[in-house]
């Protein structure tokens, strides 16, 4: 049985990105604010995502690749390495790459996809 995967956006990514992704990709995307994760540590977020099991974290944070590499998946991770940018620029970048990254993570044993 295939899980219905969700993408959880880290606190450093605007909830507006979640809204756009939900509307345009068909992927369930939730912001850290909608999940009440915005005041938690990275480890706490990792543990909550791990407990759910069908989560892909989307983050610019350098701590998440280390956590997933050290502790394993779930959760899986899309690690953004594009620097600071406004929401429109970030959405334009994600629009080009998110479907392929999602497909790789949900259909293979790959735990981390880095987008740069």
Predicted regions mapped to residue ranges:
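Conserved beta-strand termini and adjacent loop/short-helix elements that scaffold enzyme active sites
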Residues: 32-34, 60, 80, 115-116
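Intrinsically disordered, low-complexity and often Lys/Arg-enriched segments
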Residues: 1-5, 116
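Short, hinge-like loop/turn segments at secondary-structure boundaries
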Residues: 47-49, 74-77
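N-terminal first-folded block
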Residues: 6-55
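Histidine/acidic-residue-rich catalytic or RNA/ligand-binding cores of hydrolases
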Residues: 69, 73
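Acidic, metal-binding active-site segment of PIN/NYN-like and related structure-specific nucleases
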Residues: 49-50, 54-68
